Amino acid sequence: MSTKEQVFFKQATSKNKIHFISLGCSRNLVDSEVMLGILLKAGYEATETLEEADYLILNTCAFLKAARDESKDYLQRIIKAKKESAKIILTGCMVSKHKEELKPWLPYIHYVLGSGDVEHILSAIESKEAGEKLTSKSYLEMGEIPRKLSTPKHYAYLKIAEGCRKRCAFCIIPTIKGGLRSKSLDQIIKEFRLLLKMGVKEIILIAQDLGDYGKDLSADRKSCLDSVLKEMLKEPGDYWIRMLYLYPDEVDDTIIDLMESDPRLLPYVDIPLQHINNRVLKSMLRTTSKEQILDLLTKLRTRIPHIYIRSSFIVGFPGETDEEFQDLVDFVSEGWIDNLGIFSYSQEEGSVAANMADQISQSVKSKRLKILSQTQKKNVEKHNKQLVGQIVEAVIDGYHPDSELLLTARFYGQAPEVDPCIIVNEARLVSGFGERYLIEITGYVGYDLVGRVIKKVPGE
């Protein structure tokens, strides 16, 4: 997983200046937004400048070794750049699972908070003594918690559960985040309504596995995700709901029916498949087979022909043979997946797979990663070529990172941060970010589309 820094700031004038750096996934970002909200409500002010901050909060990621290395790099940079009197608060997944790797820098840390203890950020900052709090309790179980959005004002993430009940062989998330803990339906709907009231137009539902939502709350251990979606869709308005992280065995007919019947529940799903070969899937301790995966994808494409499917695959899992890898290449080449994340297997201490025999060399993993990436790129180029000349409804996210002469936009098949975008090079009609426009696709550059604005969507 690639990590992305998120920096939170506003103009700060007091002596209680805080500077946040959040690494890792969108779930981590929500935790950072909650901590920021708590501190702003308590009277602290956020600053963009690390060097002028009185308190520096680093929310770490530990999903893969590369993420842990990045967390350590940021910590060293903070220690070196901060003013002498500033205090560092360290939180997040790395603290919860890999604290021993942080040992050389712990003398510089004022307070350590586990990933389930974000609601204690205020007491950590105000503590006169250095300390730590590492528990498995989640703020999801608490009452109302303030939150300060760091995303553009038109979209936001809504975390409906924490932890994971799956036990995939390659993953250490359950040991970091603990077991499944679902928010109550009432709390979710309350947050959903608040986001709509704030003007958010795209709400992205996240959890370790959305489909597991409510299995810890219901007597029959069945998913209650459909209840969440039905309650949300009762709210009036022209908003988008996007689902991320929905395991293949949790996509049932009820979810498909809702996507088919209400366009506000976007025809977009992120289904982490990880592999397609049955022996590898079994070794990964996955609960679906190749046949079940193909049945699901066929059903989705048949019921909702315009659906966009995102997924992720791991290459170089222990014992993966050339033939088994070729099965994956053949599957990807068939074009089932629109947006794809590809990762080399990472031998994570504490995972079942870490102790498996037949670990694959890094050179082989890198070669397989390149082959699969090239295979998917051919699919994307073919698909993008078919989109040229079509008109799509898309939201303007903001300026392109390379030039303020360009804008970026997304249609329903593109999630923020993780998917390609539309590069808008003709935008004279755009009057504001976060608004939806009809955009003609005129070309593509790599994975990204290129387009021009035709007109604003009526009602925007």
Swiss-Prot record:
InterPro entries for this protein: Elp3/MiaA/NifB-like_rSAM, Methylthiotransferase, Methylthiotransferase_CS, Methylthiotransferase_N, Methylthiotransferase_N_sf, NA-bd_OB-fold, Ribosomal_uS12_MeSTrfase_RimO, rSAM
Enzyme class, UniProt record, top EC level: transferase
UniProt catalytic activity: L-aspartate(89)-[ribosomal protein uS12]-hydrogen + (sulfur carrier)-SH + AH2 + 2 S-adenosyl-L-methionine = 3-methylsulfanyl-L-aspartate(89)-[ribosomal protein uS12]-hydrogen + (sulfur carrier)-H + 5'-deoxyadenosine + L-methionine + A + S-adenosyl-L-homocysteine + 2 H(+)
Subcellular location: Cytoplasm
Cofactor: [4Fe-4S] cluster
Domain annotation MTTase N-terminal: ranges: 16-130
Function: Catalyzes the methylthiolation of an aspartic acid residue of ribosomal protein uS12.
The protein, known as: Ribosomal protein uS12 methylthiotransferase RimO
Annotated organism of origin: Chlamydia caviae (strain ATCC VR-813 / DSM 19441 / 03DC25 / GPIC) (Chlamydophila caviae)
